[in-house]
Amino acid sequence: MNRLRSPRLPIATLLGLAAIVVGFLIDPDTLLPTYLATVVTISAIPVGCMAVLMVTYVVRGSWTEGLHIPLTAAALTTPIAAVLFIPVLIALPWIYPWAHESGAEPGPLKAAWLTPGFFILRTALYFALWTVLALWLRGAWADPRRMVRAASAGLILYALSASFAGVDWLESLTPEFHSSIYGLLFLTFQLLAGLSFAFTIVLSTPGAPTFRYGAILLSLLLLWAYNHAMQYIIIWSGNIPEEAAWYLAREAGAWGMALWTLIALQFILPFFAMLSSKLRNGRRSLLRIAALTVGLRFLEACILALPQRQIAGIALLFAVPGTILFAGLLWWAAFAFSLDRVRRSAHDTSPLPDGFDASGTPVASAGSS
């Protein structure tokens, strides 16, 4: 996968690290939450790929087989995402208000749950569980019976752990806020990240078959929009000041523009675009929508993590590109290495459907565009 690698990547990674240092020196209270949004987005890709991989193990078909290689390769990079999360655990008092003495009092139940030591332990358990699941799924690849067994148990464990992770990592940034479906929102966040990333990798090959990728992505986007709409309606009808304040912070000023940008690009644009069968089944159009969906996960993470913080605009100019370049390219290098290894072993472990060669690379087919 030489096209996934470039001699410029190390230079870009170092430039990202330099931007992080500058952003931290300007305002650590801006840099650290931005880094959290970045690593939450990056970790959503391998974990989301692992979840989608489990779904493809249970519901198998021609469209699922072609995704196994990128999904598996991404899932196996979960330990790298865990390593990238370590700075967040070190910087807890600067990121989470409940992690220092002057922080807001979250109440007795949340106070017992939201302690630095317990938070670090839970985060370590999440990544350990997801890593074990990824390895288990990889080991079950050649045995259909083991695939179904691993995926069935894994989906239950994933749904529970990812729901708690979303509450811990993002919802607890505002301790007084609570949403009964926040965990489900985070599940769709990760699933969208994983599925759209896998589609982007597969469809980046000219002539790759599209199967029913457009309909599948549209279905998940509709679920994502439905979950967000339901949370808004529930909080609006409850009319609780602490919960309403969470939305008010995201509807004002620049964050309001960011929110409407997310709605327009993540729901309105792809919804109407994929009403057209030509766009829904075209490789290039699907590739653009899938790549856009991956990128918008970072915007969504920022909207979830940053609005109720005192953000310094100058620091943000360094924090956003710096964290994306540094953490993103480190993970990308790990993914490229993992993809090479998985592709080399693919022909020995899993038969591939028509439209894919022995290495798992899509091959040109008539009618692809």
Predicted regions and their residues:
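Long, contiguous internal "core" modules enriched in hydrophobic/ aromatic residues
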Residues: 2-19, 113-262, 279, 349-361, ...
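Extracellular/periplasmic helix-loop-helix junctions in multi-pass membrane proteins
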Residues: 174-178, 240, 278-286, 302-319
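N-terminal regions that are enriched for targeting/export leaders
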Residues: 1-49, 331-369
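Hydrophobic cores of alpha-helical transmembrane segments in multi-pass inner/ER membrane proteins
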Residues: 44-55, 82-88, 123-135, 188-203, ...
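Transmembrane-helix bundle segments that line or gate the permeation/cavity pathway
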Residues: 37-142
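Membrane-interface transmembrane-helix boundary segments in multi-pass integral membrane proteins
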Residues: 5, 180-186, 242-263, 270, ...
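Extended, compositionally biased non-globular segments
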Residues: 252-304
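Transmembrane alpha-helical segments of multi-pass membrane proteins
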Residues: 70-83, 148-160, 215-222, 288-297
